[in-house]
C-alpha cells in the first residue's frame, strides 16, 4: 500500500460526476442523503481514493482501463484465532462455524493492518530515502567543491596576510566560511551514513550526533498540552463528559436549591402568605358544603362574600335557561369579577401591583402573560366561571411545587373531541391509517391510541390550560391539608435566570448542566449544538431551558430587549416526532402554546394565520424541514427569538435548500439537537456550525483546505508521519475551537446517573445460501460490473444490485417463475421471498423463534421497503403479531402506532425502515433490535439502535447487525467504522488511530466466501481488539487442561467410522436441546481464559479438547453435515473441495498472528505442529464442510424425524459432563460467585448466550460474530504519535542527564555526589544557600499539593486518576523535599522560569539558549531519570563486558521492570544512550556513547 496521494480536486470532480447520475426513486436502498443528495458512496469513493493508484475522475466520469497497480491488501484468515477447541460446544463440530471473541478478532485484524501499514510505510520510506540520498549526494558534492575552493583561496591569501591588514581580515572571514562548511560537511556525511544504513537494510538506524544534527532534527510534537493529555486537562474534560460541568467551566453546586429557597421566601413572603390564606379559605368553604363551592377568591386578603355567595346556583340553572339569559348572566358575572379585581388591588402592597396589573382579563388563558391578543368567546366564558383566579396568580408569580401528572383521560372535556375525529379532521387518508394501524394479528385496536393534540386551536389551548390550573390548585390544597411543606425552590442562575424548582429537580445532573450551558450560550448571544448521545433527553433539556426563560421574564440584549422572557420560538424536527414534541411540552410545561405547522396539525385555517398568531402570542411553532423550505417567506417575515433544529444533521449539506432556509432566521439564538453532529465528513460539521455560529469556522473553501483535507488525509492507514502529525495538530485546534459550543455526553459516561441497563451489540456474519452465492457471483462476473470497472457506467446501480442480493436474491432476480393454477402449498418454496433462500432470513427465523419463547420484543429494521414486505409475509406465515411502519405510513398514524407498540406487550415485532423509524422515535417497549442491512451512513444504524436503548428502558438491550460475509456489506461496515473514527478524531480524541485501507473500485465488486476455517475480512482487520465472540457452550466449560472424558472418547471414535454413526444418537442430542427450550441458559466462556491469553497453553490443549468435542460434533438433523460413505464430510457448496483437517491447520491459522506482530515462518509453524502429529492423526480422515444445502438438510429431516419421539423419553435426561455421559444429569452450569445485584445481569447475559448457542448450533448460516462496541471503543492512540512523544521524552531525559553529569565533580575532587538528601557535587542551585535561613514568602516554592497552572499544559506522560502516582515531567513540583520551607535562590528561580518557558518557546529557541541553561541550573527532573540512570549503570558496569551489553542481557534485566506503556520510552532512551552494531555471529550489541562512559 504505497502512499500515493490523489489531489482533492479529483475527488470533487468525481463527486460531481457521481451526482449527475439519477438514482432510483422507488428504492429506499438508493444511497443518497435527504438533505441534498450528497451520496454516501461518493464519500466512500472520495475517501478511498487515497493510495489506490486509480484516478477518481476516471472512476466516475471517463472510461479507463482496469486497475493496474500494487497488489491489494488481503487479510490472512489463518492468522486470526477462532474459538479454541476446548472452548467449543459439542454441537459446533462439523457445522463449519467460526466464533470469535471480539477483542481477539479486533486486535488480530488490526495487527495485520498495522503490519501491512508498516510494510507499506517502509516501502514508501525507502522511496523517500532514495530521493533524499540523491539530494544528500548533491549537497555533499557541492559542499566539497566549495571547501576546495576555500582552501585554494586560503593558500593564496596566507602569504600576504602578514603584510596587509585587509588581506588578514579577508583571510579570517574565509576561515570562518571554511569552518562553517566543515561543520556542514560533517552533518551531510552523518546524514549520508544514516541513509546508507536505511538503504542497506540495517535493522537499527545509526544514531547521529545530537549536537551536530540538532538544527536538522525535526522538532518533536509540540509542547504538549496535546500529545499526551495532561492531568488538569483530563479532569476538565472528564467533568464535561460526565455532565458535571459546562464547556465554559461552570459547575452546578451540589446543594443549590437551598439558597434560592431562602431568597424566594424573603422576597415574596407576603404573596406566599396571601396564597396560603386563600387556599385555606377555599378549603373551609368546601368543608362547610353550603353552596359556596364556586365562590371566587379575590386577590385581596379580605374578600367581600356577598356578591359571590350564590355563584353555583346560576350554573345549575344555566342548563335550562335560554342562550340570551345565559349570556346576560355571564356578562354580569364578568363585570363583578372585574370589579372585585380592582377592589382587591387597592389593598395590595405596592411591590405586587405591577405584577397584578399583568393579569388582564384578555390574557387569562395565556398563563405566562405573553401579550396574547386572544379574547375569550362567550362559549368559553362558562369554562372561565369555573376557574379560580388564585391559580392563575399562582402560576405566574410563585415557584411552588407542582407534581406533573397526566391529563385525566375520562370526563366530559375529552369526550367532546374523540380520537377518530382528531385523525380525520386533519389527515384525509384515514383508510391508510386504519390499514397501517391494524397490520398484524389483533391489530384492530390501533385507532384507540390517540396522538397528542397540539394547540393550533386556541379554544382547545384555553381549555387545556384551565384544567392544568385546576390541577395545580388541587394539588396545592392537598399539600396544605397534609401540612406537607415539600415545595422546591427555584433554581437560580446568573443574571436572574430561574428554572421552576419542580421542573429542575426532575432533571438528571447532566441535564441540569445542559440547561446551565444553554443559558451561558444565551448570555453570549451564541448558538450551540447539544450533541448528547441519542436517548439522553435532549428534548427535556430544551423544554426546561425554554420554560426557565419564560418563567424568569427577563429581557436580554439578544433581540434588542424586545422579548420579555421567551419570545416566539420555532422548532424544526422530522415529521415523525412532531407530536412527540407536543406531548413533551404538555407534560413538562403546559403553559406554552404549542402549535404544529403541518398537515397533521389541528389548525384548519390558513397556515399563514397560524404563523402570525404563534408569533404574536410568543408561542412554540413546531414544523418539519420540508415546511421550513416551502413556507420560508411566511416564516421569515416575523422575528423569532429561538430557532431549534431537532435532528439538526438534516442540514449537513451546506448547499441544500433546507439548509439555506434555516440559516436565514434573524436571531443569534440557534440551537441544534443531534446525537450524531458529524456523520460522514468535516464538511457536514462546518455546515452545522455555520448555522449555530456563522463565521466561527470561516468560509467553507478555507475550512476544507486548512482543516478537512489534512485531518482526513492523516486518518488513512497509509498516511505519512508528517500527515499524521499534521492531522493531529489540526484536529486539536479544531476541537479546541468548537468545544465550548458543542456539548456532547455519552451514555457510557452518564450511565450511573441514568441507571441504564446494559447493551450488548454484536455483528452476525451470515453465510450466503447457495442460490445467493450463485446470483452474487454471476452479477460480479457480468458485463455490467465490467462496464462499471472500466468507467463506462455509474456505480450506483451495481451497488444497489449487490445489496439486494445480500438481502434476498429474489429482490434482484425476481424470484422463481411459477406456472399459474398450481396450489399454494406446492409453491411454498417457489414463492417470491421464500425465507430459506436468504442466509440472513434463516438467521432471523431462528432469532425470532428463540426470542418468542423467551418473551422478548423485537424491532426489525431494514433499509428497503421491498425487504420489509418480504419480512411481513414471513411474519404472517409464522403467526407472529407485528406492526409495520415505513415511508408510506401516514404521518398522522405514526405516533399512535409507536404508542400502541410500547403499551401493548402482546405485539411481538415492529417492522420499520431505518430512516422512518430511526429519528427521535421512542420504542422502549422493545429490548431486542435487529438491523437487517447496514447503511453507508453510520449514524443511520446508530439512530435505529438507540430507539430501544434510551431513558425509560428497564431491560437489557441486545442489538444484532446482520452482515453477509465477504460481500459489499462488509465494505459498508468498514466504511462506517472509518467515519466513526474520523468523528472521534475531531470530537473526542485527536490521537484516534488510523484505519481504512484504501479500498478501490475493484474491491467493492468482489466476493470472498470464507468457510469454516477462514475468517472474515472484518475479523482480520480488527484482530486483537477483543471483538470476536466466543461460541457460548453448555459443555466443557471449565476445562483448562485436556479432560479425562475426552481420552475415553478416543477409542470409541476409532471403533465406529463416520459412516456408521447411529442416527438415534444424532437425534437425541437435538431432542435434549429442543426439550430445554428457552429455559436453557448457556454461559459464555470467560474472556480472560488462559487459553486465549497464552498461545502456548492453547496449543497444548487444543488437540485433546478438540478430540473430545469432535466425538459429538453430529448432534441433530438440522446440524448434520452430509456424511459420505468413506467417513468424510462432503462439500455441498459446489466447489468440490474440502477444508484441511482441523487438527493440523485451523488451530495454527487462528494462533498465527493473534499475539505477535510478525507472523512466524512456515517452517516454524510446520515444526511446531510436528510434535502434535501423533495426537491429531486419528481424526485426520475427517474434515469440516464449508456449506451444506438446504435440500440435503430437509432430506435428512424427513428420514430422521419419525425416530425422534421414541428416543426422547429415554435419552432426554442424560447429559454429558467433562466428556462423559452422566445418568439422570439434565444439564449443568458453571458455578459463579456473584452478588445478588448481578444475578439479573447474569440472567440476561445467559439469554443472549443461549441465542448465540442456538444460532451456531443450527445450520442457520451464521459464520461468525463480532462485538461492535469493542471495535468502536477499543481504538488505541496512533502509534506514530506515541513514537514521537516517546522520542521527545527520551531527548529531554538525555538532556537532563547530560547537564547533570557536567555539574558533577570528578573523583579527584573528593566531593560526594548529590543523592537527593546528602552530598554537594551536582546539587541543585537551591541547595547552595549560604547566606542565612531567612525566608521570603513572596518567592517561596509552592507546596507540591497545590495545583499549578502549568499542569494544564504539562508535557509529561499522562497520569490518570486511580493509576500509579508517578511524578510528572514539568509538573511544577519542587525538585527537593525541603524547598518548600527554604528560600528560593535566584538560580533556582531562573531554572523554574526556563522550565515554564520550555512549554511555550519552540525547541529551536531553547536550543539556542541551551548554554545558558547548562551554566545556570538543571531542567526539572522527569519520571524517566531513574530509569535512564539505571540503564546507564547496568550497561557501564553490570553487563558481561563493561561499557556494552547485548540485547539479550538488556532484555533479561529490564523486561520484568517495564510496563507496556514504557516500552516506547525505553527504546528511545536506549537508542540515544548507546550505539548499536552486530557481531559476526549476528548478536546485537549496545555500546555506551563516549559522553556517557
UniProtKB/Swiss-Prot annotation:
Effect of residue 1470 to G: Loss of interaction with RIF1
Annotated organism of origin: Homo sapiens
Pfam families: Helicase_C, SNF2-rel_dom
GN (gene name): ERCC6
Domain-level remarks: The CSA-interacting motif (CIM) mediates interaction and recruitment of ERCC8/CSA.
Essential for its interaction with RNA polymerase II, transcription-coupled nucleotide excision repair activity, association with chromatin after UV irradiation and for mediating the UV-induced translocation of ERRC8 to the nuclear matrix: annotated span: 1446-1493
Region: N-terminal domain, residue numbers: 1-510
Annotated effect of mutating residue 1119 to Q: In a breast cancer sample; somatic mutation
Protein name: DNA excision repair protein ERCC-6
Biased composition range(s): Acidic residues: 364-392
Subunit description: Homodimer. Binds DNA. Interacts with ERCC8. Interacts with RNA polymerase II; interaction is enhanced by UV irradiation. Component of the B-WICH complex, at least composed of SMARCA5/SNF2H, BAZ1B/WSTF, SF3B1, DEK, MYO1C, ERCC6, MYBBP1A and DDX21. Interacts with KIAA1530/UVSSA. Interacts with ELOA and CUL5; the interaction is induced by DNA damaging agents or by inhibitors of RNA polymerase II elongation. Interacts (via WHD region) with RIF1. Interacts with SMARCC2/BAF170, SMARCB1/BAF47 and the neuron-specific chromatin remodeling complex (nBAF complex).
Any single biological process term in GO: regulation of transcription elongation by RNA polymerase II
Binding residue positions for ATP: 532-539
Motif (CSA-interacting motif (CIM)): 1386-1398
Residues the record lists as N6-methylated lysine modifications: 170, 297, 448, 1054
Location in chain, cross-link Glycyl lysine isopeptide (Lys-Gly) (interchain with G-Cter in SUMO3): 205
Domain Helicase C-terminal residues, every copy: 843-1002
Start and end residues of each stretch annotated as Ubiquitin-binding domain (UBD): 1400-1428
Region listing for Disordered, in residue ranges: 1-39, 287-323, 344-453, 1042-1147, 1181-1247, 1318-1384
Any one Gene Ontology cellular component term annotated for this protein: nucleolus
EC number, as in UniProt: 3.6.4.-
Family under the similarity heading: Belongs to the SNF2/RAD54 helicase family.
Keywords, in A-Z order: Age-related macular degeneration, ATP-binding, Cataract, Chromosome, Cockayne syndrome, Deafness, Disease variant, DNA damage, DNA repair, DNA-binding, Dwarfism, Helicase, Hydrolase, Intellectual disability, Isopeptide bond, Methylation, Neurogenesis, Nucleotide-binding, Nucleus, Phosphoprotein, Transcription, Transcription regulation, Ubl conjugation, Xeroderma pigmentosum
Taxonomy, superkingdom: Eukaryota
Subcellular location: Nucleus; Chromosome
Cross-link (Glycyl lysine isopeptide (Lys-Gly) (interchain with G-Cter in SUMO2)): 255
